[in-house]
C-alpha cells in the first residue's frame, strides 16, 4: 500500500510540474488560446498509448510502475478540469465557435494521439528498439 502511494505521488509530482512548465512556456506565446493545456493533454494521450501497449507486453512489471506512469505522472500531466474551465470561459465570453473548436480539437486530438502512441510502440517493437 505505501509503495503504491509513493509511486503515485512521485509520478504526480513530475507530471504536475511538466504541465505547469508547458503552460508557462506555451501560454506566454498565445495567451488568447492557451496551448499549454492542449500540449499537456496531447502529450499525455500519446504517452498513455505507449504505456498501454508497453504494460500489455510486460505483465511481469510490478503494478507500482503502472501506478507511477499512468495514475501518477499522466494523471497529473493531463488536465480535464483546466480544459473544462478554459472552454467554459470561452462560452461565458460568447466565443462559441472557439469553445466548440477547442472541445473538438482536445477530444478528437487526444483520441488520435492515444492511437498514435499505440502505433508508435508497435513501430518501435517492429524495429527491435523495444520489447523483442
From Swiss-Prot:
Binding-site residues for Na(+), renumbered to this chain: 75, 78
Keywords: Cell inner membrane, Cell membrane, Ion channel, Ion transport, Membrane, Metal-binding, Sodium, Transmembrane, Transmembrane helix, Transport
Modes of activity regulation: Na(+) is not transported, but it plays an essential structural role and its presence is essential for fluoride channel function.
Family named by the database record: Belongs to the fluoride channel Fluc/FEX (TC 1.A.43) family.
Function: Fluoride-specific ion channel. Important for reducing fluoride concentration in the cell, thus reducing its toxicity.
NCBIfam families found in the cross-reference section: crcB, PRK14196.1
UniProt-listed PANTHER family: FLUORIDE EXPORT PROTEIN 1-RELATED
Name this polypeptide is given: Fluoride-specific ion channel FluC
Gene behind this protein: fluC
